[in-house]
């Protein structure tokens, strides 16, 4: 068992979880194994490629594909929000995440620490799934108090 913690919240008929980057504090292989055992249908990676490479996690997408887990890589700078030109990819990810959750599946979102970028994406997904912003944020912060670290992330998450 790794030290990776999955912070889960029910959304729709499914489960949405936030976590830190696999391999951040321990073995990438062990963390990956724990994620696979959790059985997500969809994983969203928000770290930049250099962050993955620094922790020997550069082939994470290949690892997920090998076991049939759908994966989206939306690199976003630490403490940042998506760039305008990245919005179509984010829109596609949110639509996919909501679809998986409404079908009763599990969706995992991770950044480096599992707080700011992950919280921003999770809140946006929860709102897109039909939740009101404030109750969704409250539920999210019950499981992950550090979810969303900047006012820019909060504004971006709440805009649809």
Residue map of PLM features:
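Short beta-strand/loop segment at the start of cytosolic alpha/beta domains
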Residues: 1-11
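Short beta-strand-to-coil "C-cap" segments at the C-terminal boundary of structured domains/repeats
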Residues: 158-160
